[in-house]
């Protein structure tokens, strides 16, 4: 896909420079946009919404591509969607992806954090739930679940995607719910080991909603 009329866009809160353009040259048969997260059904865009009025979606280039302030035209067939999954899904449904505005960022500027979750069952029952799934307190692990100043790990979990498969199960069962408003940190919140930006390159399925807080974002 070719991008022209590129202009700089500065993300003040992240101290990152992105590059504003649009998807007017998008070709679904050639261009690959990698998604990483499911949408929230209640937040999905339904109808009678003008795609032209959408805020730009934010996408990352792959590591082998670099944009800078001298770039006036740019071409790539692969991008990673960072922010704007609901807008992307709606534009796809009505075949108006070419009307989307976008901001492209370099892969080196991408940062990933984990959302906090609240538990919807009693603490003792939640800890028992973890134990029955093989998660026990152990602060020596690299991949696990943080709760009440303890890290719970499962020695059978070999990678971050196994952990997030378990997260999907308990999220789908309403054992945990993402905290969408910034309420600060609390030991009673649940947090999962964050993905690394490199994980976005290898992921081959959609994570459950609100698995990642990726910056820069609008």
Give the label of every model feature segment.
Residues 64, 72-218:
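Basic- and aromatic-enriched surface patches that contact anionic nucleotides/nucleic acids
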